[in-house]
């Protein structure tokens, strides 16, 4: 029984789910916005916010944690250079989820998640 479990399962095993969230986080930070299902967008939101908060901290240990999570080391350096001035006046809420039309093949709820 999964009482009070906060992580959405996304229909995948734990290792596949973690890899999916890592790749979605990496691509969202790289491109600024991605189109995915609404459930995946809600799941990746917390991971992206965690990475941006680490980048705002800017310490060496925070940089190493981000390098261990994101797939692109150069992207981490760019994030740590950009995030402190871009999000200096925000304490959270770095992303926005906008609902779009349902996917044609399976009628899944789609959304665009973007960085503010």
Curated annotation (Swiss-Prot):
Keywords associated with the record: Ribonucleoprotein, Ribosomal protein
Q: Which SUPFAM superfamilies match?
A: Prokaryotic ribosomal protein L17 (SSF64263)
Q: Which Gene3D superfamilies match?
A: Ribosomal protein L17 (3.90.1030.10)
According to the UniProt entry, its GO molecular function terms are: structural constituent of ribosome
Q: Which GO terms describe its biological process?
A: translation
State any GO CC term.
Answer: cytosolic large ribosomal subunit
Xref: Pfam families:
Ribosomal_L17
Question: What is said about its interaction partners and assembly?
Answer: Part of the 50S ribosomal subunit. Contacts protein L32.
The family classification in the record reads: Belongs to the bacterial ribosomal protein bL17 family.
Q: What is this protein called?
A: Large ribosomal subunit protein bL17
Q: Which organism encodes this protein?
A: Crocosphaera subtropica (strain ATCC 51142 / BH68)
Q: What is the lineage of its organism?
A: Bacteria, Bacillati, Cyanobacteriota, Cyanophyceae, Oscillatoriophycideae
**Gene name of the record:** rplQ
